[in-house]
């Protein structure tokens, strides 16, 4: 079977009150259009056609790597007109699945079932399959009109509906599947004699009835699958539905969330056994948490891997890091891209790292900046240690070998190497390589000025 998918993404989204096209607004860290394209890809179609119009160049430039065929709708004349723009690129014998870019939570299983509905009869008597739903509040959506035998014979958009039709709870989702040959016959016959003055795709139902093409429907099991986004309130509602589903899936696999309503996932999160996640944590990109990991409150992890038994304390920010087993991080730590910790390392409060590689058992417990640095095993980094890695033009590396003890308030001016088991005295500024096994410090003589008086403020007149 040749499957062609059309995604409608040309709408202006006026009710978003935004300079950003509606389909680029984010849900769970990804644009709405990306959600729909990723779902469509799971059906293994022969092609995905995205119909763009309003803000089209912005959409294309923002999502340059989407595996789609872009089709321009120069004038936004309605959904039927939008689908018509893609038809020259689709063979007559292909099955066409029409989706909407602002309906991001449609499930692949539902779409697969709809495609199967459209194939149940001989292709010579092809079916028009519609995805429908029963909603308690169907406001704003097209209503399904059935005859006395329960057969669908029309869809009426709300702006064209009378009060009797508005009381109908069954709605059309905007998702349909049929042979391309049918659409190529029906779409040129659409009329714009309606309240919007547009060419509605829903009018193909009446044309299918006239042509005696069977119409079948599939009712979505979950109403959220067919919920569209037209304003920011609806975007927030679907965000919470997506997050709740993600939280439930994690808990089903053995993770504990302190409060599923205060958890945000903006990518992929893979958890081992007995993982604990406290409140207000944000996971972005791809995050892997090993067995027994604990994430404290108010943490942000982006593209991070944690080994077994790690603990990240409150208010820590980790990005682009690889952490081995049994490490402790935070509170208030910031680990930036390129940070790698071997097992049993500790990064304490108000420590920032970037391109820092720690070997086993190394600790930086307080108030330090460690950038472009290699640290050996069992190094102790004292409070207030700074690697001075930037000369205003280039970055330089610091190498700290095994067993080094660095006293508090030390500046290491890169490029510099500290030899194994060396000790650096507190308050030192190290500009040259430090020999192993020795104490190195920079001394400034302490001086006491006897009889010195503090300045006294004069009383103002």
Curated annotation (Swiss-Prot):
Pfam families: Hexapep, NTP_transf_3. GO terms for molecular function: glucosamine-1-phosphate N-acetyltransferase activity; magnesium ion binding; UDP-N-acetylglucosamine diphosphorylase activity. Its EC number is 2.7.7.23, 2.3.1.157. InterPro entries: Bifunctional_GlmU, GlmU-like, GlmU_C_LbH, Hexapep, Hexapep_transf_CS, MobA-like_NTP_Trfase, Nucleotide-diphossugar_trans, Trimer_LpxA-like_sf. Its cofactor is Mg(2+). One of its GO terms (biological process) is UDP-N-acetylglucosamine biosynthetic process. UDP-N-acetyl-alpha-D-glucosamine binds at residues 8-11, 22, 73, 78-79, 142, 157, 230, 336, 354, 369, 380. Residues 1-232 are annotated as: Pyrophosphorylase. Residues 254-461 are annotated as: N-acetyltransferase. It is an enzyme of class 2 (transferase). Signal peptide: none annotated. It catalyses: alpha-D-glucosamine 1-phosphate + acetyl-CoA = N-acetyl-alpha-D-glucosamine 1-phosphate + CoA + H(+); N-acetyl-alpha-D-glucosamine 1-phosphate + UTP + H(+) = UDP-N-acetyl-alpha-D-glucosamine + diphosphate. GO terms for cellular component: cytoplasm; membrane. The keyword Ribonucleoprotein does not apply. Residues 233-253 are annotated as: Linker. Pathway: Nucleotide-sugar biosynthesis; UDP-N-acetyl-alpha-D-glucosamine biosynthesis; N-acetyl-alpha-D-glucosamine 1-phosphate from alpha-D-glucosamine 6-phosphate (route II): step 2/2; Nucleotide-sugar biosynthesis; UDP-N-acetyl-alpha-D-glucosamine biosynthesis; UDP-N-acetyl-alpha-D-glucosamine from N-acetyl-alpha-D-glucosamine 1-phosphate: step 1/1; Bacterial outer membrane biogenesis; LPS lipid A biosynthesis. CDD domains: GT2_GlmU_N_bac, LbH_GlmU_C. The active site is at residue 366. Binds 1 Mg(2+) ion per subunit. Acetyl-CoA binds at residues 383, 389-390, 408, 426. Mg(2+) binds at residues 102, 230. Keywords: Acyltransferase, Cell shape, Cell wall biogenesis/degradation, Cytoplasm, Magnesium, Metal-binding, Multifunctional enzyme, Nucleotidyltransferase, Peptidoglycan synthesis, Repeat, Transferase. Catalyzes the last two sequential reactions in the de novo biosynthetic pathway for UDP-N-acetylglucosamine (UDP-GlcNAc). The C-terminal domain catalyzes the transfer of acetyl group from acetyl coenzyme A to glucosamine-1-phosphate (GlcN-1-P) to produce N-acetylglucosamine-1-phosphate (GlcNAc-1-P), which is converted into UDP-GlcNAc by the transfer of uridine 5-monophosphate (from uridine 5-triphosphate), a reaction catalyzed by the N-terminal domain. Homotrimer. This is Bifunctional protein GlmU.
